[in-house]
Amino acid sequence: ESGWNRIFSFNLEPGYVLLNKLTSVIFNDFRFFMIIVAAITVFPMMSVYRKNTRNAGIEIVIFINMSTFIMMFSGLRQAIAISLGLVALSYAQERKLVKFILIILFAMTFHLSAFMLFFIYPIYHHKLRKQSLWIIVPAIVLIFIFNRQIFTLLTMLLPSAYSDATLSFSNAFTMIILLVIFVAYSFIIPDEGSLDETGKGLRNLLLFSLVLQLFAPVHNTAMRMNYYYLVFIPLLLPRVMESRKDRWANLTELSKFVILLFFTVYFFYYAYTSTGSLHVFPYHFFWENV
């Protein structure tokens, strides 16, 4: 335990250190700190999801299969920042720019990578036309082909904590394939006249998430940056389904069933067989002796 004069001498973001110190002064029990972190993480996320939900079942099964869900069990600092990122999305939807900026600056006091949230506002409100896909799709292909070279250049612009990272290959191709499927689904299925502004904004964020994911095979830093955007995807797909074109009605109903079944089965299979996912599985309660 450290005195107040030393709390900002740690090589950690000040918001997290201050929260840790305040909790230790009041409770002096690490379990209470975990409870508070869980509350700060879950309740803002729950509020934004509840506000934007269209199909809770589909949203839940997609969310728990996103890598962000697993990370939240161990990456406490970034879990708080991601939750605040959902609040930032809410402010972006309401065009409250000052509050949007302030909540992101606050999130950065818990994890510096939260600077990625600043992209939400312009991307969400961009009026993207389907004709633009003739440029976007080839650009995405080129980014994937030259992802290593592009990432090397981008790291020069990042804070030193990220720019000092050495390049390494990771197994992130499965998520790329999944995001490509989601992007195709979100552009093919809906009637553009029926898809509301929230749906179009979330679809823009999905495209940006795909672009970020293209760099994940090069280095896990890109995956860390994308955690902030993966949590928006579960909110998008039910809106796409609601706005489906008449000719895709049967396919949409089938996709609901497939998504619910596949992601439910996959989650339990992954939880049962996985051994290296940030030591989350198999899950043990704190009172268990393992």
Segments predicted by a language model, with ranges:
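Transmembrane alpha-helices of multi-pass, membrane-embedded glycan-processing enzymes
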Residues: 20-23, 33-44, 81-84, 233
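Transmembrane-helix signature of polytopic, membrane-embedded enzymes
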Residues: 46-66
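Transmembrane-embedded, aromatic-rich helix segments that form part
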Residues: 100-103, 113-124
